Amino acid sequence: MQRESMEVDVVIVGAGPAGLATACRLLQMAQTAEKELSVCVLEKGSEVGAHILSGAVFETSALDELIPDWKEKGAPLNTRVTGDDVYYLPNKKSSFKFPNFLVPRPMHNHGNYIISLGNLCSWLAEQAMELGAEVFPGFAAAEILYAEDGKVKGVATGDMGVDAKGEQKASYEPGFEFHAKYTIFAEGCRGHLGK
């Protein structure tokens, strides 16, 4: 059974912060240049943000550049850091607070936000789609596709309806191919295609 395929300009594997920010920026640049650009983002999770480790302290300078009006657009950044402390824990029974002047500047989070990265990714996916991206949750890229000259030409999703022995069940459906001029791997630290 032959796989169905879709032709796009850019396919991005991974709908985390990096993949979605990339989709947004590429589409912003295309709009500025008055060029057509088809961007497709594949996410293995059943919904965007489902595979993101949740909590984070977020510094907004990158978001300020990417989407300057993020506050007006309802970005899920609601809880500002009002203070933070750093402790040394030499054993289970004692702790020592470092004086603030000894704490390295990058570890001071005053004015940053405490956020859910999953919620931020859901919101970034909305922004990317408003710009024209197609976002496909539940589409795990399983293999890299190569052209005859050895260049990457896209990715394919895994086949469905395959049993533990690798044999096709009655519900078998072949994976879907995404062919692209550019393939961007933003699958995170545990991504298997980038290995």
What are these regions (language model features)?
Residues 1-13, 17, 132-139:
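Glycine/serine-rich loop-strand microenvironments at binding/catalytic pocket rims
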Residues 9-40:
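N-terminal Rossmann-like FAD-binding beta1-loop-alpha1 element of flavoenzymes
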Residues 18, 47, 190:
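Conserved Rossmann-like nucleotide-cofactor binding loop
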Residues 36-93:
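N-terminal FAD cofactor-binding segment of flavoenzymes
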Residues 51-53, 99, 195:
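Short, solvent-exposed loop/turn and secondary-structure capping segments
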Residues 95-117, 126, 154, 169:
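Helix-loop-beta segment of a Rossmann-like dinucleotide-binding subdomain
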